[in-house]
Design a protein with these regions (language model features):
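Hydrophobic, Leu/Ile/Phe/Ala-enriched alpha-helical segments that form helix-helix packing faces
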Residues: 42-51, 133-141, 178-179, 242
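A generic structural motif
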Residues: 102, 115-120, 162, 220-222
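Conserved acetyl-CoA-binding loop-helix of GNAT-fold acetyltransferases
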Residues: 116, 122-144
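Terminal substrate-recognition subdomain of acyl/acetyltransferases
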Residues: 1-36, 49, 145-275
Length: 275
């Protein structure tokens, strides 16, 4: 894949103002392996933000993901993981990572972590960073030989608004302004698998983590609903991604939750993320 570029055509509808940001100020580097000289620098910055809360995968897990080849199916899907570092004059500006999970029907991109240095916030850079995963989706589709124009959906798992966590509320409002929508949590109860160590899980019961699904259906951002079948397809891809690292027994509880999802043709509302 060629270097990541700043492509205004990939903006979410509400991120058009980000075009005012001059991308020549920064450079984007894809970290290709644990041996990359920039890996520890990038991982360290992400760890400072997400590690203490247990929200960042281990080096080993990310190393395995970076080695994935989208031309070699995993669980029947092409998968491509990208860890991106943004710098200006050699200094840290931002980092983000995400994974495309694709087949002939299209690509779902799981948005993992996004960190922007405070000095670079509220200047338009975040809109560009929300658009970069589309390039990962297209690269994944191309490597697997799937149609280049196949549908793409970006999905982030976010905690529910609580009116207390200010940073969380700001993040949800930013995605709402950009044009992302939330799958109605009153109808679809999404959970992550248990991220604790195997020893902790074995000493107790699996603890599933409730999250809301925040989506951008590229080219379909104005849609007010999707179907139960579309939700199920999306969540199945996320679970297939998690299943690459989790034990089958630890995935059983989340797989079972799909049994309670709406019927394939049932409409499921897409709501503002702060609703």
């Amino acid at each position: 894949m060629a270097k990541f570029a700043f492509l205004p055509a990939d903006f979410a509808p509400g991120d058009a103002k980000s075009a005012e940001f001059d991308p020549s100020q920064v450079e984007v580097t894809r970290i290709g392996s644990l041996d990359d000289p920039l890996f520890e620098f990038t991982y360290g910055r992400l760890w400072e933000q997400f590690g203490p809360a247990g929200e960042l995968e281990s080096r080993a897990v990310l190393g395995r993901r970076m080695a994935w080849d989208a031309a070699q199916p995993r669980a029947g899907f092409a998968m491509r993981y990208d860890l991106l570092l943004v710098r200006s004059g050699g200094e840290f500006v931002a980092a983000r990572d995400h994974t495309a999970i694709a087949d002939a029907r299209g690509a779902v991109v799981h948005l993992s972590h996004l960190l922007v240095d405070p000095a670079w916030r509220r200047g338009g850079l975040a809109g560009w960073l929300r658009a970069l995963p589309l390039q990962t989706a297209r690269a994944c589709l191309a490597a697997a030989g799937f149609p280049p124009g196949a549908p793409v959906t970006l999905v982030a798992e976010m905690e529910y608004p609580d009116g207390i966590d200010v940073a969380r509320d700001i993040r949800l409002k930013a995605y709402e302004r950009a044009g992302f929508r939330k799958v109605d949590p009153a109808v679809v109860h999404f959970h992550q698998p248990d991220f604790r160590s195997f020893a902790e899980i074995d000493a107790s019961q699996p603890q599933l983590l409730p999250f809301q699904l925040i989506l951008r259906r590229v080219g379909r951002e104005a849609d007010s609903y999707l179907t139960g079948g579309e939700v199920r397809t999306l969540v199945e891809r996320l679970y297939h991604l998690y299943a690459q690292e989790f034990r089958p027994a630890d995935m059983q509880a989340v797989w079972r939750q799909l049994d309670a999802y709406p019927a394939a043709d049932a409409p499921v509302a897409l709501l503002p993320p702060t609703a």
